[in-house]
UniProtKB/Swiss-Prot annotation:
The chain crosses the membrane at residues 3-23. Its main location: membrane. It is a single-pass membrane protein. The keyword Transmembrane helix applies. Keywords: Membrane, Transmembrane, Transmembrane helix. It is found in: Membrane. GO terms for cellular component: membrane. This is Uncharacterized protein HI_0213.1.
Length: 63
């Protein structure tokens, strides 16, 4: 399941760099893949949803 998220994240990041999607979407996908790679603590769906919401807020601040 994580492999699917990683592949989707990198695809959307590459598409965002090309410019089809807004850059905030690319930031969002990049942070999701970053946390999946470095933090192996995705044990419950609740923490995934919480981090997803938190990262979407931080990516909006960055962009």
């Amino acid at each position: 399941m994580k492999i699917i998220y990683i592949i989707l994240g990198f695809l959307s990041l590459a598409i965002g760099i090309i410019g089809i999607f807004p850059s905030s979407f690319a930031y969002h996908a990049f942070f999701i893949t970053y946390f999946i790679f470095l933090h192996k603590r995705f044990k419950t769906l609740r923490t995934m949803v919480f981090r997803h919401k938190y990262l979407s807020k931080t990516s909006q601040v960055l962009s």
